[in-house]
Amino acid sequence: MPVDFLTSDQKQNYGCYAAEPNDVQLARYFHLDERDLAFINQRRGKHNRLGIALQLTTARFLGTFLTDLTQVLPGVQHFVAVQLNIHRPEVLSRYAERDTTLREHTALIKEYYGYHEFGDFPWSFRLKRLLYTRAWLSNERPGLMFDFATAWLLQNKVLLPGATTLVRLISEIRERANQRLWKKLAALPNKWQAAQVMELLVIPEGQRVSALEQLKKGPVTVSGPAFNEALERYIRLRSLEFSRLNFSGLPAIQLRNLARYAGMASVKYIARMPQQRKLAVLTAFVKAQEITALDDAVDVLDMLILDIIREAKKTGQKKRLRTLKDLDQAALLLARACALLLDDNTDVPDLRQVIFKCVPKNRLAESVSKVNELARPQNNNFHDEMVEQYGRVKRFLPAVLRDLHFRAAPAGEHVLAAIHYLAELNGSKKRILDDAPEHIITGPWKRLVYDAEGRIQRAGYSLCLLERLQDALRRRDIWLENSDRWGDPREKLLQGEEWQTQRIPVCRALGHPVDGRKGVQQLAIQLDETWKAVASRFEKNAEVHICNEGKYPSLTISCLEKQEEPPSLLRLNNRIKQLLPPVDLTELLLEIDAQTGFTHEFAHVSESGARAQDLHISLCAVLMAEACNIGLEPLIKHNIPALTRHRLSWVKQNYLRAETLVSANARLVDFQSTLELAGRWGGGEVASADGMRFVTPVKTINSGSNRKYFGSGRGITWYNFVSDQYSGFHGIVVPGTLRDSIFVLEGLLEQQTGLNPVEIMTDTAGSSDIIFGLFWLLGYQFSPRLADAGEAVFWRVNKSANYGVLDKLARGYADLSKAESQWDEMMRTAGSLKLGTIHASELIRSLLKSSRPSGLAQAIMEVGRVNKTLYLLNYIDDEDYRRRILTQLNRGEGRHAVARAICYGQRGEIRKRYREGQEDQLGALGLVTNAVVLWNTLYMEEALSWMRRNGEEIIDEDIARLSPLMHGHINMLGHYTFTLPEDILKGELRALNLNINNELSP
């Protein structure tokens, strides 16, 4: 295993002064208190006192003693000398002229201040134990472990060993942890299971690829045969019975990484591994792939049912168009007959004869029959056409009933009973069903399920069950064991003793009282006071008016006037654009890496110590290939080792994945937050969320249809989150255009940057009562831009309160007693979300899909209505608030424009078939977009500094309105070189573009 994993900076800075300490570091490490001065003043001569003081403070700061104190930086020498009343630090040259003096002083410091040698017991043992725990539980890069070890040694007053000693120790510990993991995994399968997984590496007779390669490939189309194939894949994995093995005690992240590695590595490479490691890798793969295969199969089933419904609607609409002429004729004939019935001049005794004389009886009967045949009930959802597809359903329904082991919550028990009933009839050709559970047969289905004699028809019953099954699956009333995406979300909430232990800390962290009555009282008081405050100011609000023309009063909110850019801002924008130097995107990535070191976050999927020369160049090339959507081919340079086809393919397969992209992106976001200019734009507490649409012209199940965005094809949505500093801190790939509200919380809860956004802006699609409620429970502010804010329902909790001019507007009543009775459950749900035991989208999906909300869902909706009203009242009361929402949403849209410019290849279409590939590619796009934003911010700061130095006038208010979302100076097309000048590699900025006419246009 390679042991030289340190970067050049780590090697250079280990145990040395890298730069002058800042004021905080000087105060913490180099301040001498009375005890220090008493110890130092025991030495004779200024040179000895200054020397031992510098040795002491250096040991505190660096964790080691220096043999040559001239390496101590001048600022440190001066800071320490002043405290000793030594006015000439030059006396230091006389220090330690004898080696004995140096040894004596270091020994005195060690004894007096309690410093230890690295080899002393128990310090070395404690460090090894800590490092082993980290290596076992995580896939942390060895470079980070090195930094952790250095910090731990410094904190515990253990003198640093040589860098190679620490590197070798970390490498040995990592190897031991890996060997232990492989040993434990390899010991789990029995002999039969071990033999079966080894057979996966063999190419079956008559086939071209191994069984392992076949199992790697998930479904890409939606059809009955595709579902059957996906289910067979799951059954094959399930038959190995790995779900019965005990994987507890094994680190989940390590298992995921091993499984991903097996999914990407070639079969030949796995076959050449040592037996123990090979079995461990295959065991991790089978365990993870069984869950994935089940999820994929149910995904296809869900989309297949949706396709049947969509096809039925399409067929029904075509039928409707073809029969409209006949229906119109029959309706007109019946209208003539009814007109005679309504005519008061028609003699009642002769009514039938009069009607039949005008409209012949046989034609009237034909018209009645035609209307009954062609007219559709109001609640009909093309169920007739669904039943017509029973022949298609018969091809996959038996497999659903036989091979998927469903479980049910109480609300899904009737559906589960129907599933079990039909499962018992598998293989039977009975068309009429006896004693079938009838609770699932509701509304319009009754006409299609029951025949004229009241008997249950199998075709109608099967289609009815299929529709109910999909609904129950989406609500998680029906769920599957050993499934990630279709499992029971309730099991992932904090349970029993664990919740009781976390209950009080969770409530405190979220800012809610433990007592539900107190919590709802506070909320009710807040709403009442806000109503009264806004009502008292409403007469002075010229932008909002009450409209009483409709059934209920509503509000008319004037559109925000465009905020004109003053001439000074236009000049400043123009000047900065002129000063920004032109740059290739390739160089930009390398330059940002030199500034931030973001490529250090990319670790090998299974051998996280594996590095290669100029790896950062290879990583930047792969990131550009993915972000620009051009593939590796244009970037391959056979004469440059870092850009060969083999190197780039190796890097793409082993380094580019979700967790490394997230870590690298976090480094860029955190660096952006340290810049003064970014601080002028915002503090990182505000963010917006919006979707960016991409067409997917390839066959994939991870896409959806939406004619507005994807035409006649299918596509995906990249739902991403942008801070008020213009940095993108999270992104989610969504099939098609699912409701934004399902994912809006996930970006706040799962983002891993140093930002702490507490308020998020979205468009109308991200809004619902439950979302408002969950945001409040978690301590966040939800601020959507509602297209129909004036028409929205405003809620009150005090029925008798009078809110003056706004009183009639408060027509909804929020029943907070529901929230009080469910308070503990709401806190448990919020705590589970905050602690990450359940994904926000998984919980929200189950809450939103329910047509019969549970008590918990109703409680969240009630507090959501109150908080929605609080938001609406502030929205109509404060024009600055409305403008702030609009400004932040515009930032997100502007960032999308930059991302579109970067992702120019293949017409901007995403051609990855599987979810993981789509996530990796769009993660790379987000990373490169952040790199562009960061580069622009750095050079905008430099341009502003240059303008100040040259006496140009800059108005502070204009700086806050600048934007780093420009890209005209960045070349993204056709020129791919990965070289930088030496000074820029060291972190210097390139020269501004000063070869311009300094005269600005008026």
Swiss-Prot record:
GO molecular function list: DNA binding; transposase activity
UniProt family annotation: Belongs to the transposase 7 family.
Function description: Required for transposition of transposon Tn1000.
NCBIfam families: transpos_Tn3 (NF033527)
Protein name from the UniProt record: Transposase for transposon gamma-delta
Lineage of origin: Bacteria, Pseudomonadati, Pseudomonadota, Gammaproteobacteria, Enterobacterales
Pfam families assigned to the protein according to its UniProt record, in alphabetical order: DDE_Tnp_Tn3 (PF01526), DUF4158 (PF13700)
Key words, A-Z: DNA recombination, DNA-binding, Plasmid, Transposable element, Transposition
Organism of derivation: Escherichia coli (strain K12)
Example GO biological process: DNA transposition
